[in-house]
């Protein structure tokens, strides 16, 4: 079935350019020219992926992304001329999955869109994600493999598909492994690493907010200076009990 992609941008020529290339791939395109129009459509109709400009009237892209990620689980790609590191970090921190800077190569944009759709929908196909157990537990943390859910003691947190893949990578190899940023990126994003450390740092920060009692003093995801990250082992918590 053809996937539905919403493009929210106040520049009609940008929408038309993306629409031209995406319709060649048989995607259904919904056009929105401000944030409120995009939000109202998504509230009433199913959308598989949203492409959002930052600078829009009525409701800007950052506000729209915050609303979307609080209420919906769909891939979000920022498409913007605001390409400072601070803009990228803010957008990814609010829940966006990718950031494409204007001007852009439409073929590269299509490839990134397809990658996000592939990840989002492959995650929901159990035959392609065979997992031997229903959950993995380390300390007070339990990752449920049948849904995007993590339990921290008695508290329940929803995680995005990307956060699930990142946390699962850590938890499946939590004994002694130190992951470089390149290894984490290629495992969780399934793409070749392009030395974008900000993307990884933002996602690690978001995960820590959900799984750590004190995110600034992490127990589970530990930074190994100069090397990368290490996840707590089950032995660490067994020792606490003795």
From Swiss-Prot:
Function: Member of the two-component regulatory system GtcS/GtcR which may act in the control of the transcription of the grs operon which encodes the multienzymes involved in the biosynthesis of the peptide antibiotic gramicidin S.
GO biological process: regulation of DNA-templated transcription
Name of the protein described by the UniProt record: Response regulator GtcR
Residue positions, PTM 4-aspartylphosphate: 53
Post-translational modification: Phosphorylated by GtcS.
DNA-binding region boundaries: 133-233
PROSITE patterns listed in its UniProt record: OMPR_PHOB (PS51755), RESPONSE_REGULATORY (PS50110)
Single GO molecular function: transcription cis-regulatory region binding
Residues spanning the signal sequence: none
UniProt domain Response regulatory: residue ranges: 4-117
Record keyword Transcription regulation present: yes
UniProt xrefs under Gene3D superfamilies: 3.40.50.2300, 6.10.250.690, Winged helix-like DNA-binding domain superfamily/Winged helix DNA-binding domain
One annotated Gene Ontology cellular component of this protein: protein-DNA complex
Source species: Aneurinibacillus migulanus (Bacillus migulanus)
Swiss-Prot/TrEMBL keywords: DNA-binding, Phosphoprotein, Transcription, Transcription regulation, Two-component regulatory system
